[in-house]
Amino acid sequence: MIRVLFMGTPAYAKTILEALWFSEEVEVVGVVSQPDKPVGRRQELTPPPVKESCLRLAPHTPLFQPENLKEERWAKEWRALEPDFIVVAAYGKILPKVILDIAPCINLHASILPLYRGASPIHESLRRGDAWSGVSAMRMEEGLDCGEVLGCSFVEIKEEWGVSRLFEELANRAAALTLKVLKRFSEIRPLPQVGADSSYCRKIRKEEGLVGFVNAKELYDQFRAYKVWPGIFLRSELKLKEITLLSETGEHHMGEILAINKEGVVVGCKEGSLRILMVQAPSKKEVDAVSYVNGKRLGVGDILF
């Protein structure tokens, strides 16, 4: 039986954790997740998905939510669990060396390393319009996602996929890859990352959702990447809640309404065009785009801004 201490926080990590629980060859000896955080307008204290899964499926498994990993007691308690491995998936904090030294630490990073090291690899892959993504199992060491690679799983990104769908696909691939690496760990010949090929992605900021009608394909890719948060919005703070890419070519006045029909509002970009289906004005409810432009008395040839 392979003894695993698991560290993770969001739904991506929950999928991996549940695969470990349902494996007959793995024993999860402890779960570490971020502390509960206020969520929504009411700021209700909400447990992360990994904690919810732990309480539902394995309520007797030791569960830890440390504020500060550098406190000596955490390394002491986790070492006492005698894990063979520490599996880390989107935990959200950098692990100090004292924890890395407890047992081999395997991180499931949602990119093909060394591409997109850092906090938002899935969003970055969509924002750049990549045709492929994937997950990497990496032997952790001090530094940001720079350890030796133990295995990868590739995923072809379909054009209609947004961030939620790609998250789901990568989580399933990561779960399968985790079990494979744990079972074959002693046989694997790790591959060092080539630093010259590396790229980095930071934590997403709200202002990155600001868009303009310059390039239709790039705007659509921003929508795919940021649909969950922060969303995409114009300078007027009008949120574009649902859009589709019509054409990557064709030159238009930026924001010009090209057509209004039952399928939505077609808007031109400096390069290409989009169909807008749903929008949301500041402090208003989400409405279909046709109702919005009709309410604003906008017609074909007018500018949406």
From Swiss-Prot:
Gene Ontology cellular-component terms listed: cytosol
| Enzyme Commission code(s) on record | 2.1.2.9
Q: May I ask which residue range the UniProt record assigns to the signal sequence?
A: none
The alphabetized UniProt keywords are:
Protein biosynthesis, Transferase
Q: In this entry, which stretches build a coiled coil?
A: none
Query: Which InterPro entries does this chain map to?
Result: Fmt (IPR005794), Formyl_trans_C (IPR005793), Formyl_transf_N (IPR002376), Formyl_transf_N_sf (IPR036477), Formyl_transferase-like_C_sf (IPR011034), Met-tRNA-FMT_C (IPR044135), Met-tRNA-FMT_N (IPR041711)
Q: Where does (6S)-5,6,7,8-tetrahydrofolate bind?
A: S111, I112, L113, P114
UniProt GO MF annotations: methionyl-tRNA formyltransferase activity
Q: Gene3D superfamilies this protein is in?
A: 3.40.50.12230
Catalysed reaction(s)? L-methionyl-tRNA(fMet) + (6R)-10-formyltetrahydrofolate = N-formyl-L-methionyl-tRNA(fMet) + (6S)-5,6,7,8-tetrahydrofolate + H(+)
What is this protein's function? Answer: Attaches a formyl group to the free amino group of methionyl-tRNA(fMet). The formyl group appears to play a dual role in the initiator identity of N-formylmethionyl-tRNA by promoting its recognition by IF2 and preventing the misappropriation of this tRNA by the elongation apparatus.
NCBIfam families assigned to the protein according to its UniProt record, in alphabetical order: fmt (TIGR00460)
UniProt similarity note: Belongs to the Fmt family.
Name listed for the protein in its UniProt record: Methionyl-tRNA formyltransferase
Q: Identify the coding gene.
A: fmt
